[in-house]
Design a protein with these regions (language model features):
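Flexible helix-coil linker/hinge segments at domain or subdomain boundaries
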Residues: 254, 351-357, 473-480
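Peptidyl-prolyl cis-trans isomerase
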Residues: 57-61, 65, 252-259, 303-306
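M16 family metallopeptidases and their MPP-like homologs
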Residues: 1-55, 75-81, 152, 159-250, ...
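Short amphipathic alpha-helical segments
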Residues: 236, 334-338, 399-403, 407-411, ...
Length: 558
């Protein structure tokens, strides 16, 4: 029944937002129609057909079909395990014996499970009314609730049958003591979220309760900000806001569930840490930040330090109340319809007295030029290279942000020509540029590529030459024209995304800048010299970190 509910919810949502589909959503169905003669239907037609089929198919027919597609013959057993000294590997006879035992075993069918349909009783919540209302940026409506929460609403039809929200506060990981950060390493935090659940419901039960609903809600922690974000259909928005409320009012800390999560991580960690990708990440972090204790990478030591009590202590400190909090809600909703839901659920978050503020813990990239060139065992010999350039800026300017985006676009084109087409040394290099505003304005540029061992040193040299050339001589007229046209093309494409407007609202609230308007102005007024200026400012800082991971001699020889 839950599987049917999930499928019906998927096809129902697809039908409602058929008019706002993006091009990429049309590609696969058309390919299937052309090559496999699979029927191409409008989403509304497909939804009606699925409903009819589900009414005609009894559960017994599904069970019979499963039995038919899992016969005793034509069975293949695939076994994968690390090649590790002292690990006893099962034989083919062991697998056959296990299969024979299962065949004659009496396996009881799953028992029907009673799953609650409601996360809470709305009647128990007092809520709080709207204290004030005003017009906001981008056609939004701004409410201030009596509990202090600022609510920014931007209804639109750009993406039908979809609502997204972000409830955020200042603080984030910056407020967590250094000694507690192992409990908030990304894998540990993700495991806690997935297993522990919410209120009186463990994670597995929450998943079952959300069957047939298009709802995704989760608490999050960034470096300087934390909160609860989510998405849903308009029909399921009440459930989404209930969960947002519960992540503040009634979080769940279940030791048994947490232990399960940590044990799962322990089971995969020994093999995971042997992977070249893990070793590369570990060396990269060490090269960028040295032994900064606030920089945590998963390890046995990290898991040993992870503690549910530590998570609970810090979580309750961060997600305690609505003081200083703002929620942006964008998408397909009606303001009058959403009003009682906002007052009931978001208005029931505790008021609080003093807003939290982030702290600058000085997690800065190490100064100077450093090259970390190391070797690891790997089955498929290749060299992985990342070059990181960093600079502190005197001030943040959106024009610099646009110029850096333009620079990465041009570098991608140049590296495709020089590293891939001319040298044949890589499938492609990727560049990424970013300017952060807080805690201090800072620009970072990364160049990343994989290559064959014999070509690595030359490609590193060419990548540096390409960057220096762009900084010194600027882009060609053709490169600049292509780049500006691409940036201009992306503007209207971005504006049909609810997530874009969430970010624009948060940017305006945090920095007082009309991102949408100013970004377009910067693109229109961009000059080649702007690209040179930001690159030269980054290069002038002298902060350059190069990490090169090569295969060891034995692997390379093979």
């Amino acid at each position: 029944s839950r599987a049917k509910d999930d499928l019906l919810a998927y096809f129902e949502s697809a039908a409602k937002k058929a008019d706002t589909r993006k091009n990429e959503e049309l590609v696969e169905p058309l390919i299937n129609n052309f090559f496999d003669n699979y029927a191409y239907m409008a989403p509304e037609t497909e939804y009606e057909l699925v409903k009819q089929l589900f009414n005609m198919i009894p559960d017994q027919a599904i069970n019979q079909t499963v039995a038919q597609i899992i016969p005793d013959n034509n069975m293949v057993v695939i076994y994968k395990a690390p090649e590790k000294e002292g690990l006893e590997q099962p034989t083919a006879a062991d697998f056959q014996q296990a299969i024979d035992v299962i065949k004659v075993s009496e396996i009881k069918p799953n028992e029907a499970e009673s799953i609650e349909s409601n996360f809470l009783d709305p009647a128990t919540l007092k809520g709080s009314a709207i204290k004030s209302e005003s017009e906001g940026i981008y056609g939004s409506t701004v409410w201030t609730l009596k509990n202090g929460l600022t609510v920014v609403l931007r209804p639109s039809k750009e993406e039908k049958d979809k609502v997204v929200f972000d409830l955020y506060k200042d603080g984030g990981k910056s407020l967590i003591p250094t000694g507690d950060l192992s409990s908030f390493e990304s894998n540990v935090w993700g495991a806690f979220q997935g297993f522990c659940g919410i209120s009186k419901f463990p994670g597995t039960t929450v998943t079952k309760m959300l069957s047939g609903k298009n709802v995704g809600v989760e608490p999050y922690l960034n470096a300087l900000r934390h909160g609860v974000r989510g998405s849903s259909t308009p029909k399921d928005l009440e459930t989404a806001l209930q969960l947002a409320y519960l992540y503040f009012a009634d979080p769940r800390f279940d030791q048994a569930e947490f232990d399960k999560a940590i044990n799962q991580l322990r089971a995969v960690l020994p093999n995971f840490v042997l992977q070249p990708s893990y070793k590369f990440t570990k060396e990269l972090q060490k090269t960028l930040y040295g032994d900064n204790p606030r920089n945590i990478v998963i390890s046995e030591e990290t898991l040993d330090k992870a503690n549910l009590g530590t998570i609970e202590k810090n979580y309750r400190m961060l997600f305690n109340d609505a003081a200083g909090a703002t929620i942006n809600i964008c998408g397909d909703f009606d303001i009058e319809t959403i009003k009682p839901l906002v007052e009931k659920y978001l208005g029931s978050i505790k008021k609080g007295k003093k807003p939290l503020n982030w702290v600058d813990n000085n997690k800065n990239m190490l100064p100077g030029k450093v090259t970390n060139d190391f070797k690891v065992d790997m089955q498929t010999p290749k060299v992985t290279v990342i070059e990181v350039f960093d600079a502190k800026l005197k001030e943040y300017r959106l024009l610099d942000d646009v110029a850096l985006s333009a620079a990465t676009y041009i570098l991608d084109m140049r590296y495709t020509k020089s590293l891939r087409e001319d040298e044949g040394g890589t499938y492609g290099a990727s560049t990424h540029g970013e300017i952060s505003i807080l805690p201090k304005p800072e620009a970072t540029l990364q160049v990343y590529f994989d290559t064959k061992p014999v070509a690595a040193d030359k490609l590193v040299e060419l990548s540096i030459e390409g960057l220096n050339s762009l900084a010194k001589d600027g882009p060609t007229a053709e490169e600049f024209d292509m780049t500006v046209k691409n940036l201009e093309k992306n503007i209207p494409e971005s504006r049909i995304s609810n997530e874009y407007w969430l970010g624009a609202l948060r940017f305006a609230n945090t920095y007082g800048i009309d991102y949408d308007k100013e970004y377009e102005n910067c693109v229109k007024n961009l000059k080649p010299a702007d690209i040179q200026n930001i690159l030269n400012e980054i290069l002038a800082s002298g902060i350059v970190k190069t990490v090169i991971m090569r295969p060891d001699t034995a692997a390379e020889a093979e």
